[in-house]
Amino acid sequence: IRDSYYIPDSILLIGSADKTEYWKDANALEIVNTVVERMNAAGYTRTDDKDTANLGLQLSYVQKVTYFVGYDYPYWWWYYPYYWTPGYWGDWAGWHYPYSVYYGYTAGSLLVEMMNLEADQESGKKLPVIWDSFIGGLLTSSEELNQQRTVDAVQQAFDQSPYLKK
């Protein structure tokens, strides 16, 4: 399907444990569904088959302060086991930016990343991120307010990116 995308029904948790964990409750699904609604409204079609999708979307929630070293290092994911598993999308070794980038994400941050799944699939190639959104400052003492702020911020990320429309 042309202009199709794949998105999991869960949110990757970063900094929560020494193993990969996912956020899968009703709140997580509301956030995922907000992204789905906005992608569909922009003219894309969701597919359950990541092998036929043109784009992949990953949502990640930072539970504690996290620092990523440089994306230019070819095996950076070895230093942060909570992030992408290298074979998730296929033969790609992982995604990267074409230059050295250093980030410090604070607790309560949501990352939304769109990957080009039609990139060169030769073994060892990087999966390119073609759009991303960093949403910080989501934590308050109210879980209900945190959830509403997160959903509103996802809406705002798409509002600020009108070029995503087909």
Question: What are the roles of these predicted feature ranges?
Answer:
Residues 2, 39, 52-56, 105-109, ...:
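Extracytoplasmic
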Residues 36-45, 62-65, 158-163:
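Sec-exported extracytoplasmic/periplasmic mature domains
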Residues 43-53:
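Short acidic low-complexity segments
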Residues 102-130, 135-166:
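C-terminal/domain-edge helix-coil "capping" segments
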Residues 4-8, 56-60, 111-113, 131-134:
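Soluble periplasmic/extracytoplasmic beta-strand elements of cell-envelope proteins
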Residues 59-120:
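Surface-exposed short loop/turn segments
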